[in-house]
């Protein structure tokens, strides 16, 4: 038996598909294999279900190992267009049935077939089913780009010596399922999360369905709330918790007429259910009468195959955004449908961040996969009229909340180097939520509704200032700062406009003047910073308001030191020198205040009030330590002490990244080693990798690897999540469930005491209820490559301090390239505007002496050494990057 690729885990293996892209061949029989089962709330999802993401810039297909696909679409409100509710004969869609009169082949996985192969690919789910000398190869893929549809490509093969008359029946449901946060809050308040889905389905049941034929090729479905067709005519958008509008959906054959259809999914499946539907036994009724919850879109094509012959059918399933017509959506697909999967797959290779390292092929595979998973999670919000990269995971798919504002800003960091358009859209999205005084709200629910929680994190403005500053410094896109955008609530009499720059300054003023500093000169904490549990899970409830007023955050302070230095660079580029001085002065005051909180071993974590005092004096909290290093707030003689403590107390015992705390804290409501009480967080470890890259190259590289999917799969091969996607936090070695993510023990024990713990939790959901498609474990490994090559953008250009401890590697992206070989270094810089740029290489003294040749834009130049640096200048032009090489001979 051949050895699996590194990082494959138990449930299948990594392969390279026919397009040269990574894919995961899933081989687990989840129905009969106990290793497939994880503890979760089975009223929400099956404990045997494993999920893969197939998406583009407009929608997300959540693909199940059972073979069905649910389509997430966010216009109106985030929702599934096609619910999976077996009790009501609703099975989502994306599968079908091949019938030869006697036998049946299904692309829904039942565990009973002769052969059923599944491949989770970049942009697709592939299912290859064989039996009765017939085979079906079905690929459900999301075409690359911004089109609101999936393609079902079905290749049918007759492997017999006789001709066959066959029927292919394609199924897609159309009962929607809104991710209503209102339903979540109601169920949580009643201490029964099973009510959440019940209430969401009750809301969906208030919509009637109306079907029409699309010529002889398919079906178009419209929904109306309680039969009122005038609901869709409202002109001025208003923020809502739940939307009474839903887009039209369609199912269309792209290469041939349909020869039967049904709109009644309930009767189609009948008593036989999904494995042996009643409807396959005879002809489909071909009527449009169904208007209630029984609705579905089912179409049939008939195929005559000669012996050994194959034929491919194509179907499009999708929705129509407001103002978009079906012909517009389908025009290109009807013309060149045979090449669409190839084109889409090839497109995923473009405009991405890449890293290849000699003798470590798994690194390049993982990087390509992260690029895909990050971008394919994108959806479109029609209230803010921008694309969004929400955190996904349990937050979006279970609770129905787009939180927190800092998260989409982290997710776009890698796109600075490959897709500026996406970066600007997310920045605009966040700016459009900003309140009149410059406060950024915690998050958004429903359609444009600011989340109604008494929670006011004090760090959110920092993330906006940082990401925007990094974007401007990298791309030199100063024009973006003058772009005019609408301000919240965007529509009606209260609507207004401002520029990006004015909004940034407004947010800066909120951070420095309204949030401001406390008695120790540190940034105030409010109800929390990055860590929601710093106050809510740590401070007695009766003290919350006092801590909100007086508390101070060392995490916010250390982060602000760095962020404000970058914001000052941005202001300097646009020659706003008066404000530059103000920002630098404020940052310097924070640096002085932080240094006063060094306890001889590490920096403290936070100050609450005079009664509760400091936290983080006896226990090492990871969060503020990396930012202190990044912001140069650590004295040189403190650095070895701090790094040694991080390594010894947080890193050494973990195979999958540093944990948040050196030991658990009893007063926290969460189990030790879980979530904020000492769990492992990729978003925090991303800052740790960055900090380590400044002081310890070997440790930085080691920490980067520990936080990869491959290392999680090697350390915990029997945990399915963490192989191709994962959650935002894993349990650390302080937990008895190391390597898993959070779940309530009640779902193992059934003990009433454990149920009580669950009911007292501030969220009430298992992270295992939807343990994948969080974007932090995909975004941070990509962004951290910049730190491994030591790239830093400055006012004048780009600076490199390469630390990756490898003889040969190659980093590339549309904006920036950097390559190391035995002969030397080379690279390019391609900002969005023309200019002359300063390039600085910081190298070891012994290495510096070996270089004797410099090429700039293919012309020989003299090498200029300034202390331990090579410094030169070069010009980039439109479509012509600044290219350079330094060589040893």
Question: Which residues are covered by each model-predicted region?
Answer:
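Catalytic cores of carbohydrate-active enzymes
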Residues: 169-171, 441-442, 559-667, 705, ...
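Non-catalytic C-terminal accessory modules of carbohydrate-active enzymes
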Residues: 71-130, 134-135, 674, 687-889
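Aromatic-rich carbohydrate-recognition surfaces in CAZymes
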Residues: 401-408, 412-523, 554-557, 561, ...
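Acidic/polar, glycine-enriched structural segments that form the non-catalytic walls/loops
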Residues: 177-178, 196, 207, 212, ...
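Active-site acid/base region of carbohydrate-active enzymes
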Residues: 358-376, 383, 418-421, 430-439, ...
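An extended acidic
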Residues: 7-15, 55, 60-130, 223-280, ...
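Polysaccharide-binding surfaces and accessory modules of carbohydrate-active proteins
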Residues: 143-146, 150-280, 331-349, 723
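Extended, loop-rich substrate-binding clefts of extracytoplasmic carbohydrate-active enzymes
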Residues: 100-149, 274-299, 368-372
């Amino acid at each position: 038996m051949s050895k699996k690729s590194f990082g494959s885990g138990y449930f299948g293996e990594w392969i390279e598909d026919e397009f040269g892209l990574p894919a995961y061949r899933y081989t687990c029989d989840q129905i009969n294999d106990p290793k497939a089962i994880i503890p979760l709330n089975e009223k929400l999802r099956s404990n045997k279900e494993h999920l893969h993401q197939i998406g583009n810039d407009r929608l997300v297909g959540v693909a199940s190992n059972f073979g069905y696909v649910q389509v997430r679409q966010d216009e109106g409100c985030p929702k599934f267009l096609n619910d999976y509710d077996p009790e009501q004969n609703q099975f989502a869609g994306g599968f079908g049935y091949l019938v030869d009169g006697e036998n049946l082949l299904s692309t829904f996985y039942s565990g009973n077939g002769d052969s059923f192969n599944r491949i989770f690919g970049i942009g697709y789910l592939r299912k290859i089913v064989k039996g009765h000398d017939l085979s079906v190869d079905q690929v459900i893929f999301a075409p690359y780009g911004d089109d609101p549809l999936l393609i079902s490509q079905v290749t049918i093969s007759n492997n017999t010596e006789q001709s066959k008359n066959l029927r292919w029946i394609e199924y897609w449901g159309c009962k929607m399922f809104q991710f209503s946060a209102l339903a979540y809050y109601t169920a949580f308040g009643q201490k029964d999360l099973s009510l959440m889905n019940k209430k969401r389905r009750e809301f969906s049941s208030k919509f009637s369905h109306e079907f029409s034929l699309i010529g002889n090729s398919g079906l178009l479905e419209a929904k109306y709330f309680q039969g009122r067709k005038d609901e869709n005519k409202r002109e001025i958008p208003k923020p809502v918790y739940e939307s009474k509008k839903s887009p039209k959906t369609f199912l269309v054959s792209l290469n041939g007429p349909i020869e039967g259809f049904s709109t009644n999914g309930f009767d189609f499946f009948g008593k036989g259910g999904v494995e042996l539907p009643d409807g396959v036994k005879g002809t489909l009724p071909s009527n449009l009468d169904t208007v209630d919850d029984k609705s579905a879109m089912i179409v049939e094509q008939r195929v005559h195959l000669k012996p050994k012959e194959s034929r491919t059918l194509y179907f499009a399933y999708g929705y129509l955004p407001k103002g978009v017509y079906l012909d517009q959506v389908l025009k290109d697909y009807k013309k060149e449908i045979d090449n669409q999967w190839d084109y889409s797959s090839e497109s995923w290779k473009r405009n991405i961040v890449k890293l290849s390292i000699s003798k470590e092929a798994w690194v390049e595979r993982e990087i390509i996969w992260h690029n895909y998973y990050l971008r394919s999670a994108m959806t479109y919000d029609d209230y803010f009229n921008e694309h969004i990269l929400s955190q996904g995971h349990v937050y979006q798919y279970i609770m129905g909340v787009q939180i927190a504002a800092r998260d989409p800003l982290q997710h776009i960091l890698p796109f600075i180097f490959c897709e500026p358009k996406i970066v600007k859209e997310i920045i605009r999205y966040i700016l459009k939520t900003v309140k009149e005084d410059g406060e950024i709200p915690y998050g958004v629910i429903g359609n444009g509704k600011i989340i109604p929680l008494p929670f006011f994190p004090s760090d959110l403005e920092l993330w906006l200032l940082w990401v925007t500053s990094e974007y401007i410094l990298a791309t030199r896109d100063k024009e973006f700062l003058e772009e005019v955008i609408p301000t919240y609530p965007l529509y009606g009499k209260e609507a207004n406009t401002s520029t990006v720059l004015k909004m940034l300054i407004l947010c800066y003023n909120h951070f420095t003047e309204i949030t401001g500093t406390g008695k120790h000169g540190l940034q105030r904490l409010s109800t929390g910073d990055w860590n929601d549990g710093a106050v809510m899970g740590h401070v007695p409830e009766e003290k919350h308001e006092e801590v909100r007023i007086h508390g101070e955050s060392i995490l916010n302070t250390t982060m602000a030191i760095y962020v404000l230095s970058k914001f000052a660079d941005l202001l300097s580029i646009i020659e706003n020198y008066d404000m530059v001085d103000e920002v630098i002065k404020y940052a310097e005051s924070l640096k002085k205040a932080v240094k006063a909180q060094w306890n001889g071993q590490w920096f403290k974590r936070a100050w609450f009030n005079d009664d509760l005092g400091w936290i983080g004096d006896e226990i090492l909290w990871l969060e503020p330590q990396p930012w202190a290093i990044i912001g140069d707030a650590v004295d040189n003689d403190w650095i070895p002490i701090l790094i040694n403590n991080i390594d010894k107390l947080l890193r050494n015992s973990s195979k999958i990244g540093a944990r948040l705390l050196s030991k658990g804290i009893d007063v926290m409501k969460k189990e030790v080693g879980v979530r904020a009480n000492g769990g492992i967080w990729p978003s925090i470890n991303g800052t740790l990798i960055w900090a380590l890259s400044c002081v310890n190259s070997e440790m930085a590289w080691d920490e980067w690897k520990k936080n990869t999917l491959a290392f999680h799969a090697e350390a915990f091969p029997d945990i399915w999540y963490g192989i191709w996607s994962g959650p935002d936090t894993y349990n650390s070695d302080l937990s008895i469930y190391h390597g898993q993510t959070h779940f309530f023990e009640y779902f193992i024990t059934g003990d009433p005491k454990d149920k009580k713990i669950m009911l007292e939790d501030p969220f009430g959901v298992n992270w295992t209820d939807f343990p994948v498609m969080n974007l932090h474990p995909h975004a941070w490994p990509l962004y951290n490559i910049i730190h491994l090559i030591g790239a830093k953008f400055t006012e004048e250009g780009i600076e490199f301090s390469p630390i990756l401890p490898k003889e040969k590697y190659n980093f590339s992206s549309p904006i920036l390239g950097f390559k190391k070989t035995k002969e030397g270094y080379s690279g390019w810089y391609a900002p969005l505007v023309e200019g002359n740029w300063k390039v600085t290489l910081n190298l070891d003294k012994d290495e510096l002496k070996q270089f004797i040749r410099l090429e700039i834009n293919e012309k020989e130049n003299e090498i200029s050494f300034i202390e331990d640096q090579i410094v030169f200048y070069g010009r980039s032009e439109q479509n012509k990057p600044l290219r350079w090489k330094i060589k040893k001979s």
